[in-house]
UniProtKB/Swiss-Prot annotation:
Family (UniProt): Belongs to the class-II pyridoxal-phosphate-dependent aminotransferase family. Histidinol-phosphate aminotransferase subfamily.
GO MF annotations in UniProt: histidinol-phosphate transaminase activity; pyridoxal phosphate binding
Protein name per the record: Histidinol-phosphate aminotransferase
Cofactors (names): pyridoxal 5'-phosphate
Length: 356
């Protein structure tokens, strides 16, 4: 008699799945955490909603209205979810038939697009970016048959650069009537002029992912948004959980999106950008650093001599960076979150001490 294990009962694609290696999952025992693109200090909030015996609204009205006003869209073009990661998954669940349809993304980029698709049983197609990390439009065009959702991160994580807006327009024309194009704007607060939110009227198949985890300094809240036309939002509403946001999360999100919350966010952004420029200038003078890439975000990608040794050396000193060596075209690269001046100085001093 054959014994069937619990693992044997699991779906084959789940058995074969490599889970996303989040910064927290990778661990480390540090006191300088520069591996998850978080804001370096906590912002304080007071809970005002105490009725925790009642279920929350599925889409909290104040949160939706505040975010719509902030993003310059209509409330019916906004969906709030448990982080932008849930938005990534909802789009696949709403638009992709497992075993039939595919998603497409352009590495090196954020790892959750593939993990979400693989979990659901949807094929992943990749078209690596060009040498300048811009879209390979011909390559995308050649692979579009059967693709229902295309993910483009701009500014891109982990490289830090914006995608050329004309290339976005070409992609949106290529996919019209065929696929949803998802612009992942998790870091758009650091370069707000580049948002595609104003394009929604022109492109019914455009969706935009946003988050409160970065510039709003609320990574622990798990609150994200999808901006899209009402037809797309209505489809996502069919597959989202009935109560995606807890009452305390909605309460804090509404406060963060108040006029004074937006002002505070913009002050944080200005501070991070100033610190980013300081850190870039310092990195460019350090012998073990081969190249520092331009960034429109709250992190810096740099190529190092002996990057694995540098990564481990800093790790052992309690400075936790993000190793990007395994990503296509990123050999020797580490990603450094922009933190406080004190944290920047710890990184600079540690790197200066590295023997080349």
């Amino acid at each position: 008699m054959s014994t069937v294990t619990i693992t044997d009962l699991a779906r084959e694609n789940v058995r074969n799945l490599t889970p996303y290696q989040s910064a927290r999952r990778l661990g480390g025992n540090g006191d300088v955490w520069l591996n998850a693109n978080e804001y370096p200090t906590a912002v304080e909030f007071q809970l005002t909603q105490q009725t925790l015996n009642r279920y929350p609204e599925c889409q909290p009205k104040v949160v939706i209205e505040n975010y719509a006003q902030y993003a310059g869209v209509k409330p019916e073009q906004v969906l709030v979810s448990r982080g932008a990661d849930e938005g990534i998954e909802l789009l696949i669940r709403a638009f992709c038939e497992p075993g039939k349809d595919a998603i497409l993304y352009c590495p090196p980029t954020y790892g959750m697009y593939s993990v979400s698709a693989e979990t659901i049983g949807v094929e992943c197609r990749t078209v690596p970016t060009l040498d300048n990390w811009q879209l390979d439009l011909q390559g995308i065009s050649d692979k579009l048959d059967g693709v229902k959702v295309v993910y483009v991160c701009s500014p891109n994580n982990p490289t830090g650069q914006l995608i050329n807006p004309q290339d976005f327009r070409t992609l949106l024309e290529l996919t019209r009537g065929k696929a949803i194009v998802v612009a992942d704007e998790a870091y758009i607060e650091f370069c707000p002029q580049a948002s595609l939110a104003g394009w929604l009227a022109e492109y019914p198949h455009l969706a935009i992912l946003r988050t409160l985890s970065k510039a709003f300094a609320l990574a622990g809240l798990r609150c994200g948004f999808t901006l899209a036309n009402e037809e797309v939002i209505n489809l996502l509403m069919k597959v989202i959980a009935p109560y995606p946001l807890s009452t305390p999360v909605a309460d804090i999100a509404a406060q963060a999106l108040s006029p004074q919350g937006i002002v505070a966010m913009r002050e944080r952004v200005a501070q991070i950008i100033a610190e980013r420029e300081y850190l870039i200038a310092a990195l460019q003078e350090i012998p073990c650093v081969e190249q520092v890439f331009d960034s429109e975000t709250n992190y810096i990608l740099a190529r190092f001599k002996a990057s694995s040794a540098v990564f481990k050396s800093l790790w052992d000193q309690g400075i936790i960076l993000r190793d990007q060596n395994k990503q296509p075209s990123l050999s020797g690269c580490l990603r450094i979150t922009v933190g406080t001046r004190e944290e920047s100085q710890r990184v600079i001093d540690a790197l200066r001490a590295e023997q080349v």
